[in-house]
């Protein structure tokens, strides 16, 4: 009987190759059946999923995966998944009085959950700007839809999220983007709990190699941008710009210096 490998990831274009690979039967020769599960709650929710054994591997933001391990999860990092850095948009509601990141100190920040990327990068951003981190206020909103409600209601005033995914909200006038934060390390890593590592040790590399091959084919295809745009509700121009800049990682060497910085 074929075993099942359960993979968790955010419902964003970075993970589109997993859906394409499943659809194309790219994992059939790997010896496992791959099930991809969306985690709108982000890296914090995936950390819980690994801990509760709801998923076997997770495509986590690097900073969140490292924090989870430092907190004693016992998870392992298999490889870098996306080696290009993530650009976080700093967003406010359309009617907000905030016009610059310099004005953000002391304002309430929407986060998907504590330990998530939206939480950790808000802290990184505040530290880089010299703000008092101990005075930061956070409002847990679960996901992007929760952030939209929270900013509209005025419960939170600031929200950091991957800028291409929020571009439609900026274009529509619901959000304003007042700044960006680019983090100096790879965007995503592949994390695995030890039970899955023991159970699927022989299949994991074949699965991950198949995903990289699918990602490379997507980038090389003439209609790649239009497919991404349709799948994630963004403009084709934004999809093309994102696809041109993203770098899925092929090798299995962990960038020790970057992880130390995290």
Where are these regions (language model features)?
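Conserved hydrophobic/aromatic packing and binding residues within compact polymer-binding modules
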Residues: 50, 151, 239
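Pocket-lining segment of extracytoplasmic ligand-binding domains
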Residues: 139, 145-228
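Short, glycine-/small- and polar/acidic-enriched structural segments
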Residues: 2-131, 138-141, 157-163, 175-182
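Secondary-structure end/capping motifs
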Residues: 200-262
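Short secondary-structure boundary/hinge segments and terminal tails
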Residues: 45, 67-68, 86, 144, ...
């Amino acid at each position: 009987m074929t075993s099942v490998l359960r993979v968790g990831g955010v419902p964003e274009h970075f993970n589109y190759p997993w859906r394409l690979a499943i659809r194309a039967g790219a994992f059939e020769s790997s010896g496992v059946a791959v099930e991809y599960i969306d985690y709108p709650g982000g890296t914090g929710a995936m950390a819980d999923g690994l801990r509760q054994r709801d998923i076997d591997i997770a495509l986590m933001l690097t900073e969140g995966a490292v924090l989870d391990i430092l907190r004693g999860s016992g998870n392992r990092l298999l490889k870098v998944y996306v080696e290009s850095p993530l650009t976080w948009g700093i967003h406010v509601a359309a009617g907000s009085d905030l016009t610059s990141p310099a004005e953000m100190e002391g304002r309430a920040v929407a986060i998907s959950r504590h330990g998530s990327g939206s939480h950790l990068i808000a802290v990184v951003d505040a530290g880089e700007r010299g703000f008092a981190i101990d005075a930061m206020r956070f409002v847990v909103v679960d996901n992007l839809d929760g952030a939209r409600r929270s900013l509209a209601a005025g419960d939170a005033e600031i929200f950091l999220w991957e800028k291409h995914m929020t571009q439609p909200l900026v274009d529509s006038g619901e959000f304003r983007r007042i700044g960006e934060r680019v983090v100096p390390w790879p965007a995503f890593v592949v994390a695995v709990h030890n039970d899955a590592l023991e159970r699927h040790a022989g299949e994991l590399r074949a699965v991950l190699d198949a995903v990289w091959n699918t990602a490379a084919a997507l980038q090389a295809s003439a209609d790649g941008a239009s497919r991404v745009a349709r799948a994630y509700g963004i403009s084709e121009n934004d999809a093309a710009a994102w696809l041109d800049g993203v770098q899925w990682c092929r090798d299995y060497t962990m960038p020790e210096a970057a992880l130390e910085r995290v």
